[in-house]
């Protein structure tokens, strides 16, 4: 007796094999994937290319000829989206850099994140430079990091010597310079943080 799936036992048609159910990869399907991704996420051109190539490889497996044909379609689509302005690496990098500072990421970590997303070195450097004076942006990011992690003036409990070393280590792991970390940790309260930030302008 052949095993029946729950769908077949319920009287519903059986499940089709994945190969039969999969639509052929053509320009319309790749564009649908790209638009669905861009509706949900901001993306650089290289990141969108990687996302689409992963989907193609997942769908086609080891069919090298079909994968190459799909890559050509992806390249054409990315070039068209860049020309139309739908993909703008400079704007993507600038927005991601601003959000990074607001979330407490160091400028080094922001630059590394942009490189990981496929943003070119020129666009990444311009985005970091657009944040203004590097020291002020780094200090603002360090203050946001301290607030998110409850360090320095945002800590809940009195500080022991071992805790101070641990807090300095947290700043170092996040990519902040020691003098910036010490300046933030030296603040007694949020008013001191505001004074520190206004003094850096």
Language model regions located:
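An alpha-helical, amphipathic repeat domain used for nucleic-acid recognition
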Residues: 1-201
């Amino acid at each position: 007796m052949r095993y029946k799936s729950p769908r077949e036992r319920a009287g519903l048609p059986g499940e089709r094999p994945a190969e039969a159910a999969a639509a052929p990869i053509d320009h319309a399907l790749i564009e649908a994937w790209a638009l669905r991704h861009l509706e949900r996420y901001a993306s650089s051109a290289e990141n969108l290319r990687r996302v689409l190539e992963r989907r193609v490889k997942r769908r086609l497996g080891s069919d090298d000829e079909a994968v190459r044909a799909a890559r050509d379609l992806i390249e054409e689509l990315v070039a068209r989206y860049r020309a139309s302005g739908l993909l703008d690496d400079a704007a993507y990098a600038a927005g991601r850099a601003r959000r990074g500072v607001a979330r407490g990421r160091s400028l080094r970590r922001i630059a590394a994140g942009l490189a990981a997303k496929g943003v070119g070195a020129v666009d990444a450097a311009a985005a970091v430079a657009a944040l203004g004076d590097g020291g002020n942006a780094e200090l603002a990011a360090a203050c946001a990091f301290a607030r998110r992690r409850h360090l320095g003036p945002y800590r809940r409990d009195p500080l022991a010597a071992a805790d101070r070393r641990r807090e300095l280590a947290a700043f170092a792991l996040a990519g902040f310079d020691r003098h910036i970390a010490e300046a933030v940790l030296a603040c007694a309260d949020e008013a001191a943080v505001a004074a520190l930030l206004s003094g850096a302008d």
